[in-house]
Amino acid sequence: MFTSEEYGERWAKYIECKHVAVDYNRNVFPVSGTMIRANPYRYWEWMHPIVRAHYVKRVVLLGTDSTGKTTLARALAKHYKTVNVPEYGRIFYEGFSEIPDAPEKWVPEDLVHIARIQSETEDWMRRKSGPVMICDTDAFATQLWNWRYYKEFNPEIERLIKPADLYIICGTDIPFEQDGMRLDDQSTRKGHQLKTYDELERRGWPYMALHGNLENRIAKATEHIERLFLADPGIPKTA
């Protein structure tokens, strides 16, 4: 057994193996398990990616069509030098539209598939993330789209939902841009936004709303994120 702990000898004796002391004075590796548990963000680079994943704070962007989610997600990920989990639904749609004679409308199973892959992608990218992980969307957002299309929540999608540490609702006060897959119906868009607020309130999950241009949104989002998650001086501000 290799340890840097004083109790290593007793532990090795208990399980009947040889103990090899390594770097008792922490000259080579200036960190310990006790130090990491006390402030994991201060010693982020010393943790294995699997361990880091446990401590990652997940920030998810929400909003109806053309509210600047993707642009803001990329900007926040760049600001914090962390990962941006992309929107799998868009990838799925673009591939789906290339299939000859593909159905014109999605079916509920498509949204379950999208939510599942989105969640799996998040789990994988947590290991690549910094202390804060930015998500363009998540399974909860997919559930809101399921409600928009079918006026009900899908229990299969519900089982995939993992509440985020913070949800950011992007406002509709920016010019609408049609990219071929968005629905330019003001009543539907407004209903989607209102349902987003209602559900976050009902579930008691933390959220903030953003309005204004991109620069204002970045400033307000980073201020809120840093106040919530990065206020401890031990957490590196990588911007």
Model-flagged regions — what are they?
Residues M1-K57, L62:
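Classical nucleotidyltransferase
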Residues Y14-K18, Y80, P163, R203:
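Short, structured coil segments at secondary-structure junctions
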Residues D65:
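The conserved Walker
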Residues K69:
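Conserved lysine of the Walker
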Residues R74, K78-D123, A221:
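Conserved substrate/cofactor phosphate-moiety recognition/catalytic segment
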Residues V112-K162:
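Glycine-rich phosphate-binding loop used to anchor ATP phosphates in small-molecule kinases
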Residues Y150-N216, T222, F229, P236-T238:
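A glycine- and Lys/Arg-enriched "phosphate-lid" helix/loop adjacent to the NTP-binding pocket
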